[in-house]
Structure formats: structure tokens, C-alpha cells
Amino acid sequence: MESRLILDGAAGAPANLALEEALLRGNTSLTIRVWGNERSVIIGGAQLARYETDLDRCLRDGIPVVRRVTAGGAIYNGPGNVNWSIFLGREFRAGSLRYVWGAREVFRMAAGLVVRAAAGCGVRAWLDEPNRIVTPEGKVSGMAAYLSRSGLLCHGTLLLDADLEEAASLTEPAGVQLDRRYTRSRAMKVANTGIRPDAFIASVRGVVAEETGEEIEPGEPSESERAAMVALLPKYSDPVWNLGDPFEGRAER
């Protein structure tokens, strides 16, 4: 499998998250995905939706709340931000882009690419360990990762010109008694970068070319990856998976 850049999103938040897991399973080289999502809230694998969102509002307004396979905190998706994903097969090695074991090492590797891509767009950013990319104005991207014996996924959401007030209101639980068992999102000042999506994509391609010595060309999910996405879609569309308690065995892990 050659390195590839996947730019098209799937149809809707559940399908996009299903495709993320399908690519994690199927990728054996380097795949970078830059994609948008509908207005939605994406929660971490060990979170409880009602602790991380204004769930009543989301349900009332038809805003999907979808659990991802990676850990970490809740994020707002919608107009004004772009998601980036890095998939690396276990045997892939090219400069700083390589399979590493350990969440902090993965975050450092991924942040190196995103920070350099942001710099190429005129934005000074850096890694605030363990998993936040920040500028002088505030946090512009978080990161979450999943490691397996065959490969890894690290992804995040980069703020471009998002509605920060809506993002904050949708990821603020309303009148809920909290429980310490669940991973909680950490409040931090956030900021937009003002980067254009096309400029970010071009800059990412430039950084990858510097690291690998080759241009990363636009590609598509394979037939087997698309089939895996279709097979996974019922899970990511299931309220039990998305809204259920991750510690009570109701959501298949």
C-alpha cells in the first residue's frame, strides 16, 4: 500500500467515525486524512455523553453525539474546523513519521507534523504536552490516539474560524451530577487559527514530502476499507454505543 492523502469525508458523523476505525484496521503504510464533519459533538471512548454535552439540546436540535474509538475529551465538529487524521502501519518509517509505542510519543510525532503545517500557513503553534496544540491565543487542536500491534491512529480537530460560543455551549453539560469514573474534558481557552482548509492541506503535503522524500498523492479508501466502514456503521449509529455507559458493557469495545 502506497502513502495516500484522503480528503473526502463520509456522509455524516457516524459514517466518518466508522471510516476512521476502518482505516485504522486496514492501513499498512501512511495515510493522512483531512476531512470535515457535520455539526456534531464527538466524545471520547471512555466518556459519558450526558457529562460532556448539553445532551437535551443536542437531541432536541438533531445534533449527533457520536463516540469515537480513541480516548480523550469531547470536541465540537462543524463549520469552521477541520479534522486531521494520521494512520501509520507498524513497519512504516520515514523521517519523523514512524510507528511509535506510547501515547506521549505518538502525540509528539503527530504534533510535529501539524505544528509545521500550521507554520507553513503563517501560524506559530507548539505542543502543550501531552496532547494539546496551542498558539499564543489558546488551544487550537487537541489530539487522541489508538495504538494496536499493527498500526496507530492519531487524530484531532483544528479550529479555523469556528463558532467558539456554540462549541462551548454544546460541550457543556447542563445540570448533571458528575461521577469521577469517567474521563472528563479539560476546560481550556480555545482560539481560531484563521487558516484556510486548502492552505492547510497544501502545507501538510509539503511537510510529508520533506519527511518522506516523496509527494503524498490523493487516494481513496480501498474496497475492503469501505466494506469495513459499512460493517461498522451500525455501531456508530447505535444510541447504546454513543450515549451508553462505557463501563457497564453496553457498548461493544
Kindly label every feature range from the protein language model:
Residues I63-V65:
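Glycine-rich anion/phosphate-binding loops
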Residues I75:
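Glycine-rich phosphate/pyrophosphate-binding loop regions near the starts of catalytic domains
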Residues D61, P79-E210, A228-R253:
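Catalytic beta-strand/loop module used to bind and position nucleotide/cofactor moieties
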Residues M1-E52, D56, R68, L170, ...:
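Active-site loop/lid in soluble adenylation, ligation, and acyl-transfer enzymes
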Residues R68, G78-P79:
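Histidine-centered catalytic/metal-coordination loop motif
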